[in-house]
């Protein structure tokens, strides 16, 4: 399965800055009924721990345009509490994805927009995103415009 363009467009426009890789995993499970093939312990450019989820030929972080660096086994000790916390969240999400979505307002809004927003409108938002990024315009401005 390829990365979904509608989902990427919504994540980068209307929901920019609101989602993380756990949210993306939950959305993929809910919308596409797919579980990740692999879990990757990573850090972002600021050194903050984050779990990334690998699917057939893409990662959850790609929906958010995040550049994550996998951590080594030795580095896992440094991030042990964050790893435990996020793995517990993953278990909660996987246990009952429907309930998790119902109790998370931003994910409910995302799914509603994903299902109800027309392809034309999402394509228009994607085009605005491409133009803005080519001109170096900030994501926050793009989010407000979509």
From Swiss-Prot:
Disulfide cross-links: none
- The protein's predominant localisation is host cell
Under the heading Pfam families, the entry gives: Pox_H7 (PF04787)
The UniProt record lists the keyword Membrane? yes
Q: Where in the cell?
A: Host membrane; Host cytoplasm
Transmembrane ranges? 10-32
Q: One cellular component GO annotation, for this chain's record?
A: host cell membrane
Please give the name of this protein.
Late protein OPG112
- Source organism of the structure: Vaccinia virus (strain Ankara)
């Amino acid at each position: 399965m390829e990365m979904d363009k509608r989902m990427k467009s919504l994540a980068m426009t209307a929901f920019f800055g609101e989602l993380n890789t756990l949210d993306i995993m939950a959305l993929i499970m809910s919308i596409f009924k797919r579980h990740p093939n692999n879990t990757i312990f990573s850090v972002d450019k600021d050194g903050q721990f984050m779990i990334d989820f690998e699917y057939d030929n893409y990662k959850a972080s790609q929906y958010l345009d995040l550049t994550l660096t996998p951590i080594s086994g030795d580095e896992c000790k440094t991030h042990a509490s964050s790893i435990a916390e996020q793995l517990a969240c993953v278990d909660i999400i996987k246990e009952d994805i429907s309930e998790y979505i119902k109790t998370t307002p931003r994910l409910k809004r995302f799914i509603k927009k994903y299902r109800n927003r027309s392809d034309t409108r999402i394509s228009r938002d994607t085009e605005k995103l491409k133009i803005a990024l080519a001109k170096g315009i900030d994501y926050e401005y793009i989010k407000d415009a979509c």
